[in-house]
Amino acid sequence: MKKVLALVVAAAMGLSSAAFAAETATTPAPTATTTKAAPAKTTHHKKQHKAAPAQKAQAAKKHHKNTKAEQKAPEQKAQAAKKHAKKHSHQQPAKPAAQPAA
């Protein structure tokens, strides 16, 4: 049991004494436990990538922006029409006010 513990500690530290302990061990079972112990310590955690749905959502948002831009075009025409209406309305009341004064 102490030999197995010594092998695990030596394998973890990465010393050359692991080879010496493996030579002195009489049973091949402790060497098998060292090979099982080493991969258990090096566990790799995989990250989940979820960037693809976000890109699809951004593309959908861009399409919505284009539809909003198309809706703004008629509003600009209406504003231009309002400006013309205001200019004509200001000129018309001014003329009748000047005529009675003369």
UniProtKB/Swiss-Prot annotation:
What are the boundaries of the signal sequence?
Answer: 1-21
Record keywords = Periplasm, Signal
Membrane-crossing ranges are none
Q: What is its main location?
A: periplasm
**Region of interest: Disordered:** 22-102
- From the Swiss-Prot or TrEMBL record, state where the protein is found: Periplasm
Skewed-composition ranges (Basic residues): 80-90
Read off the InterPro entries from this record.
Acid_shock (IPR023497)
Compositionally biased residues, Low complexity: 22-41, 91-102
Q: Which Pfam families has this protein been placed in?
A: Asr (PF06392)
Instruction: List, alphabetically, the GO terms of the cellular component aspect.
Output: periplasmic space
User: Which post-translational modifications are recorded for this protein?
Assistant: Proteolytic processing gives rise to the active protein.
Name of the protein this chain belongs to: Acid shock protein
Gene source species:
Escherichia coli O157:H7
